[in-house]
């Protein structure tokens, strides 16, 4: 029998832990935790779980920290990645990114939203579920702080599934959603595009082969993909094709549920300038979309 939820009691319990969750989040923020450098924040999370009385806490071979509440054989997992991107130019920050500066409304710092805030919520949610008898019979709650998401998205759970042998019945991701509940995730693909040219003197561009211009055309085409249709005149229908029963008869309803995909250019690199004071090896701009 499903236990009827007392939402007022749940809200009251969450409010009673507000100060501790705030302290915990600020503690996590204080530990720089870029991908492959999560050791300090893993230790911080492990200590917090142990202090809250988790039934089991462990760190696997990849570095993921896992805490378990309950004694069932089936698992409901709550995931937060605990690595962050770098801080970039610190001069662009209004406050120390590792201080966890706090106002009445926000906690400010690297990882506060993406995604250590989710880790703080999940860690205390599992405690509340156990204290309030909300863990379903036959289940246990697994709270996971996963590593290397920013650089190797998906590898953390591949390790948990294949190496740790953990196969949850259900997974909740605590990625930020502006407070909404999202019921699906489309996933992503990264594509690298290389173009080549020939450098030349800046006063004689006609003597070279400008790779920047080539890449500019590609970037414009990638941007246009976000507005493409799926009629016969459209050469590339990928972003909307999956939504059309004509092209995706078995799964178009699921695709429509998740919505249209997006496409963007994220990074550009080059090996040498397109125009230089003297000839140099051919430039090779690359872009990741």
Annotated model-derived regions:
Residues 158-289:
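Midchain, well-structured core segments that form catalytic/ion-binding scaffolds
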Residues 57, 67, 100-102, 265-268:
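A structural signal for short hydrophobic beta-strand segments in well-ordered beta-sheet cores
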Residues 75-142:
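Active-site metal-coordination/substrate-binding segment of hydrolases
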Residues 27, 124-131, 217-223:
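Short glycine/serine- and small hydrophobic-enriched flexible loop segments
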Residues 82-84, 140, 144-152, 176-179, ...:
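Acidic, glycine-rich active-site loops and adjacent beta-strand->loop/helix elements
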Residues 52, 132-136, 164-165:
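Short helix-capping segments at alpha-helix termini
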Residues 2-88, 280-287:
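N-terminal helical capping/dimerization or prosegment-like subdomains
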């Amino acid at each position: 029998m499903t236990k009827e939820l007392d939402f007022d009691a749940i809200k009251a319990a969450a409010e009673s832990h507000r100060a501790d969750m705030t302290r915990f989040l600020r503690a996590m923020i204080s530990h720089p935790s870029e991908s492959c450098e999560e050791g300090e924040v893993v230790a911080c999370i492990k200590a917090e779980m142990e202090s809250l009385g988790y039934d089991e806490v462990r760190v696997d071979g990849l570095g993921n920290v896992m805490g378990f509440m309950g004694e069932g054989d089936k698992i409901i997992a709550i995931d937060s990645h605990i690595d962050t991107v770098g801080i970039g130019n610190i001069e662009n920050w209004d406050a120390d990114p590792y201080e966890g500066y706090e106002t009445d409304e926000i906690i400010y710092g690297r990882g506060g939203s993406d995604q250590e805030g989710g880790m703080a919520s999940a860690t205390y949610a599992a405690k509340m579920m156990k204290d309030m008898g909300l863990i379903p019979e036959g289940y246990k709650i697994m709270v996971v702080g996963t590593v290397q998401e920013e650089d190797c998205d998906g590898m953390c759970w591949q390790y948990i599934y294949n190496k740790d042998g953990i196969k949850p019945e259900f997974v909740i991701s605590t990625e930020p959603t502006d407070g909404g509940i999202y019921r699906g995730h489309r996933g992503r693909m990264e594509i690298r595009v290389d173009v080549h040219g020939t450098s030349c003197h800046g006063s004689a561009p006609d003597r070279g082969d400008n790779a920047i211009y080539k890449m500019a055309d590609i970037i414009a085409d990638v941007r246009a993909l976000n507005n493409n249709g799926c009629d016969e005149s459209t050469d590339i229908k990928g972003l909307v094709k999956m939504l059309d029963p004509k092209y995706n008869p078995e799964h178009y309803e699921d695709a429509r549920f998740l919505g249209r995909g997006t496409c963007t250019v994220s990074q550009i690199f080059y090996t040498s300038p397109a125009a230089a004071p003297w000839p140099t090896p051919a430039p090779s701009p690359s872009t990741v979309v």
